[in-house]
């Protein structure tokens, strides 16, 4: 099965450029320019990875990361012009897996996407999902509805 990548970037040229840079990797793409569109597709599809702009016309990407983390551990890579240390730390602490500042190299983006998917695959081997619970055996923890519980 092809990996399903969600690109949420309001700059149409960059949105299309990201898809073109990653197209040879046999991913299936959902491309949107607003958070509302992204929310809808996340409800309908099992997205493998999210590439998310921080500054969007209908909201803040970092707030959206927090929203996603309430229900999902999908890898999220933030893409933004916000390059101050406090911005990077805030994004990562909100739950993003990676933070890339614009402008960025599309080759570096491809590599970082690959790393996140590889990490997700490795984590899946050490986890199990059952009836809305996610069990992570290597960390001895589980999630219910995105909230962590320790055993």
Question: Can you describe what each PLM-predicted range is?
Answer:
Residues 1-118:
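N-terminal/domain-start alpha-helical segments
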Residues 2, 73, 124-125, 130:
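A structure-centric signal for secondary-structure junctions around beta-strands
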Residues 26, 128, 146:
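Conserved short-loop catalytic and cofactor-binding motifs
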Residues 115-127:
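The C-terminal output helix
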Residues 130, 137, 144-145:
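Structural motif
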Residues 150-151:
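Conserved small/polar residues in nucleotide/adenosyl-binding loops
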């Amino acid at each position: 099965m092809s990996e399903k990548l969600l690109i949420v970037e309001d700059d149409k040229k960059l949105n299309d450029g990201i898809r073109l840079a990653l197209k040879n990797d046999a991913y299936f793409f959902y491309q949107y320019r607003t958070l509302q569109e992204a929310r809808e597709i996340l409800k309908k599809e099992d997205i493998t990875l999210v590439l998310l702009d921080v500054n969007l016309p209908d909201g803040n990407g970092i707030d959206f990361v927090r929203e996603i983390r309430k229900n999902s551990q999908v890898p999220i890579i933030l893409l933004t012009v916000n390059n101050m240390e406090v911005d990077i730390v805030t994004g990562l602490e909100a739950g993003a897996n990676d933070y890339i500042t614009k402008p960025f190299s599309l080759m570096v983006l491809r590599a970082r996407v690959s790393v996140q998917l590889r990490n997700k695959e490795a984590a899946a081997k050490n986890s199990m999902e059952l009836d809305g619970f996610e069990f992570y055996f290597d960390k001895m923890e589980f999630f219910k509805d995105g909230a962590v519980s320790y055993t």
